[in-house]
């Protein structure tokens, strides 16, 4: 079952991520049906509300993912702006992606609250990896939507992530391989029984 679930998830990610981008205002129905779809939104970043997700690695180097609040149409969302390298030691803060508060257009993948990357948020309880957006909202005293954006690019190129959030590895893993082996084995057994009956 794990292999089948993973295969279905991988298929969904692959199909959604290959669709052309769509403007946020053109989305209709349940927002969950657009997870992993590339969307565009116009608004402004609020650099007074930023958070770092620690325990993130890139090319073997320790770092963080930088999340910044984004304001649009009287609504708020968190935007994952990609990986930033940690400072030389615990006392040196990382060099964050630049932010300005001018109105810009951003392009990114729509993600659901429950699919936030694993890790630990600064100043946020790590008791659960679920509903982390809600935890961020409570810590920062804001109310955001129940989705967030993995930033891909911005109309102001200086705000493009140096290391964007990558799609998860789309591997079905060993569970699917085992499942296919069992299906193949079962087929051989059925075929063998029929062959025995014919020769009997």
Across the structure, where does each feature detected by a protein language model lie?
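Surface-exposed, charge/polar-rich loops and edge strands
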Residues: 1-200
């Amino acid at each position: 079952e794990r292999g089948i679930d993973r295969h279905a998830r991988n298929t969904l990610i692959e199909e959604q991520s290959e669709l052309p981008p769509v403007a946020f205002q053109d989305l209709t129905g349940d927002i969950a049906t657009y997870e992993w779809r590339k969307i565009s939104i116009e608004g402004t970043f609020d650099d007074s509300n930023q958070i770092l997700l620690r325990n993130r690695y890139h090319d073997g180097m320790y770092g963080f993912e930088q999340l910044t609040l984004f304001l649009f149409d009287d609504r708020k969302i968190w935007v994952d702006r990609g990986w930033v390298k940690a400072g030389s030691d615990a006392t040196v803060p990382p060099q964050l992606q630049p932010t300005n508060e001018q109105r810009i257009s951003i392009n990114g993948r729509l993600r659901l609250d429950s699919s936030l990357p694993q890790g630990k948020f600064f100043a946020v309880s790590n008791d659960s990896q679920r509903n982390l957006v809600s935890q961020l909202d409570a810590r920062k005293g804001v109310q955001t939507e129940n989705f967030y954006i993995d930033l891909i690019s911005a109309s102001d190129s200086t705000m493009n992530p140096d290391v964007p959030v990558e799609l998860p590895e789309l591997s079905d893993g060993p569970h699917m391989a085992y499942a296919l082996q069992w299906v193949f084995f079962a087929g051989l057994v059925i075929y063998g029984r029929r062959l025995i009956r014919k020769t009997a």
